[in-house]
């Protein structure tokens, strides 16, 4: 299999790399010191990335993304892995894959505002006894009437302090199975 990029693919990757060097890297020291991206910088990066055609590069085509092939997407992710993740999120990269599973009212409430940059999410998976091992999760979600009641402890939730909503993982089954509760 030939992994060489076409001229167009390489041009996209090179221009994205130049954009990151020009627009993201200069803010890294400040973001590291503050431990967050100030709103004015976030808005500026978002505006400039949209103008340059780089906003939402990881989005599927049906949700406004460029519909990159896998090889180009891999190279885009390689380039975007170099600057601070917090700064990369400013380019509309904070749309967690699970949001694309939204249905009905969830699309208008969570997915579309996240794509537009109006709402930010955090992902709560890690627990004291379950790092990234989803099968070790003990936080429970139980139905009470028409509501879900969550009982458990989560930790190390990146961006929880600035998120508009949190996507939380929990077990909801009552019976132990070979795949967990």
Located regions from the model:
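N-terminal glycine-rich anion-binding loops that anchor highly charged ligand groups
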Residues: 15-25, 48-52
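Active-site-adjacent elements of ketosynthase-type condensing enzymes
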Residues: 129-137
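A short core secondary-structure module
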Residues: 151-181
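Internal helix-loop-helix
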Residues: 50-118, 158-165
């Amino acid at each position: 299999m030939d992994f060489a990029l076409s001229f167009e693919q390489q041009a996209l990757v090179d221009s994205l790399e130049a954009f990151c060097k020009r627009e993201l890297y200069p803010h890294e020291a400040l973001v590291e010191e503050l431990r967050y991206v100030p709103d004015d910088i976030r808005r500026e990066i978002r505006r400039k990335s949209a103008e340059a055609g780089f906003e939402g590069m990881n989005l599927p085509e049906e949700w406004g993304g460029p519909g990159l092939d896998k090889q180009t997407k891999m190279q885009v992710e390689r380039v975007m892995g170099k600057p601070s993740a917090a700064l990369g999120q400013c380019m509309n990269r904070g749309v967690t894959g699970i949001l694309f599973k939204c249905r009905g009212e969830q699309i208008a409430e969570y997915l579309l505002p996240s794509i537009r940059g109006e709402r930010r999410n955090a992902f709560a998976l890690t627990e004291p006894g379950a790092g990234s091992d989803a099968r070790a999760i003990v936080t429970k979600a139980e139905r009470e009437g028409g509501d879900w009641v969550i009982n458990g402890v989560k930790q190390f939730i990146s961006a929880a302090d600035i998120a508009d909503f949190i996507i939380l993982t929990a077990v909801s089954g009552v019976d132990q199975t070979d795949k967990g509760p």
